[in-house]
């Protein structure tokens, strides 16, 4: 296709030799150079990277390659181009339109600082006060909120002050907890320095005895939205932490879905005495399921079977004790085959501390089995599906959960740590806005939330100082397709 003269006239000349190509109805600019071809005895054209695109309305719009060149070359003699990370920030704001209003309602004087640091935390992985200002100045947030103080000392003071506002933080979170909802809990251990008063010796799921605090997180089952959290000492027993956190949410008639390791007779009694409904996963070596049940290879031992994702899941339900509790046991044959395959492969390659033979897999009679204790007398499929949603949450939570420890290591006081915990919570709210949008548009099968964040981080807002205002850098076709499906318009404010 011939390139229109109006497009050719907008070809940038400051980069040296460049040519315009028509691809898919759009006009892209590529760097070109010549290289001597000794075989042909003449110069040969070599096409380099694309540096942007040209439109009739906006002229040349640089992409990431073009922006780097512009910064290196200082295109204008007096004013360097102003480049801001834009795409991911604007996308997250558009996907969470109500969050601004909620923050403004409960934190009218500081909601912009909370929003800004939380977004920097999510998009750029910021985990300490000293890294906030550099990321802020490079981001679109510095244009939105250019008057807020983001120096290291200012950020430290702000976070510590935020940590003293726990009552207001709780009210903000309680507004998200609906009566009669099903709540899922996730407890993560946070390692701190030994001098921090919040930290105390206590076992975490990895059996370390380092100084630690625990953040007990509460998620709403159906939306997967994080709605509440509580910071507790590592030495406080889970029973006390659970009951205190449930009371703090203000939720009535809730169903508690806990993480593995919480089950014990004492904890069950505490939940029953508090009048709470619960679903508690049991350890693989639980005594609540008879050994002979695992050894019995006859599928007639099961009550029935249902399908999940086109694979069979067998179940057995039986009463436990005299207080209305039930044990629900399931076997996922797909998971069983997967675990057996891993065991055999490890044995063949000699992995592991103990020497094992592939045929030893026959001794692993509990593979693919998992059980729960609950005081709900319901169809076993409901128990399975409820906890399956919790597994999904665990996978998603890992994105921020893995970096919480880094944030905590910079906490010099209890108030500072609590302030970071709340900023992390707001980051999670933005993250789940993206996650739920991917689910609703059926894009989650192709792209994770992390994938989309990485793609949109490469979209910039550029002001070359030509008096025509900022422009959005070129957007890859794949990325634009994702944004269109999510209903995101990155040009709406430009």
What are these regions (language model features)?
Residues 230-251:
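Active-site beta-loop-alpha junctions of metal-dependent nucleic acid enzymes
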Residues 112, 147, 151, 181, ...:
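Secondary-structure capping and boundary motifs in well-ordered enzyme cores
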Residues 138-162, 398, 402-472:
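Extended, well-ordered alpha-helical scaffold/bundle regions in very large, multi-domain proteins
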Residues 211, 230-231, 274-386, 454-494:
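An anionic, glycine-rich sequence signature occurring as long contiguous blocks
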Residues 129, 171-233, 330-332, 336-359, ...:
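Active-site cores of enzymes that catalyze phosphoryl transfer or operate on phosphate-rich substrates
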Residues 132, 382-411:
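Short amphipathic alpha-helical "interface-anchor" segments enriched in bulky aromatics
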């Amino acid at each position: 296709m011939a390139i229109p003269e109006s497009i050719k006239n907008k070809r940038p000349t400051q980069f040296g030799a460049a040519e315009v190509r028509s691809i898919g109805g759009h006009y892209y600019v590529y760097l070109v150079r010549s290289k001597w071809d000794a075989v042909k005895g003449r110069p040969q054209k070599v096409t380099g990277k694309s540096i942007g695109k040209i439109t009739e309305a906006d002229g040349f719009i640089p992409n990431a390659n073009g922006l780097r060149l512009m910064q290196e070359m200082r295109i204008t003699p007096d004013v360097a181009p102003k480049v801001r990370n834009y795409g991911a920030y604007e996308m997250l704001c558009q996907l969470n339109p109500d969050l601004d209003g909620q923050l403004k309602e409960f934190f009218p004087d500081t909601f912009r600082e909370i929003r800004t640091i939380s977004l920097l935390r999510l998009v750029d992985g910021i985990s300490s006060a000293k890294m906030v200002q550099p990321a802020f100045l490079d981001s679109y947030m510095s244009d939105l909120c250019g008057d807020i103080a983001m120096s290291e000392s200012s950020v430290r003071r702000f976070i510590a002050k935020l940590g003293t506002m726990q009552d207001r933080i709780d009210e903000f979170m309680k507004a998200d907890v609906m009566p009669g909802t099903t709540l899922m809990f996730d407890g993560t251990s946070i390692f701190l320095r030994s001098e921090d008063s919040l930290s105390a010796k206590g076992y975490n799921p990895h059996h370390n005895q380092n100084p630690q605090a625990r953040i007990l997180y509460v998620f709403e089952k159906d939306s997967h939205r994080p709605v509440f959290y509580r910071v507790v000492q590592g030495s406080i027993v889970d029973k006390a932490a659970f009951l205190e956190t449930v009371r703090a949410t203000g939720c009535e008639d809730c169903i508690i879905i806990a993480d593995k390791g919480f089950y014990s007779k004492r904890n069950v009694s505490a939940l029953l005495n508090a009048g709470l409904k619960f679903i508690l996963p049991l350890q693989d070596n639980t005594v609540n399921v008879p050994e002979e049940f695992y050894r019995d290879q006859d599928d007639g031992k099961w009550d029935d079977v249902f399908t999940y994702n086109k694979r069979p899941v067998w179940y057995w339900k039986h009463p436990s004790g005299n207080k209305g509790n039930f044990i629900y046991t399931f076997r996922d044959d797909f998971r069983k085959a997967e675990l057996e395959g891993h065991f055999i492969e490890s044995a063949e390659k000699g992995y592991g501390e103990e020497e094992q033979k592939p045929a030893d897999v026959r001794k692993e009679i509990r593979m693919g089995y998992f059980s729960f204790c609950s005081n709900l007398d319901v169809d076993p499929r409901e128990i399975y599906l409820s906890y399956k949603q919790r597994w999904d949450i665990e996978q998603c939570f890992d994105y921020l959960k893995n970096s919480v420890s880094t944030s905590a290591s910079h906490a010099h006081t209890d108030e500072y740590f609590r302030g970071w915990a709340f900023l992390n919570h707001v980051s999670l709210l933005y993250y789940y806005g993206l996650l739920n949008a991917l689910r609703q548009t059926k894009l989650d099968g192709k792209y994770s939330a992390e994938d989309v964040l990485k793609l949109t981080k490469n979209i910039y807002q550029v002001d070359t100082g030509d008096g025509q205002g900022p422009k959005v850098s070129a957007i890859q076709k794949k990325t634009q397709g994702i944004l269109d499906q999510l209903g995101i318009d990155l040009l709406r404010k430009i």
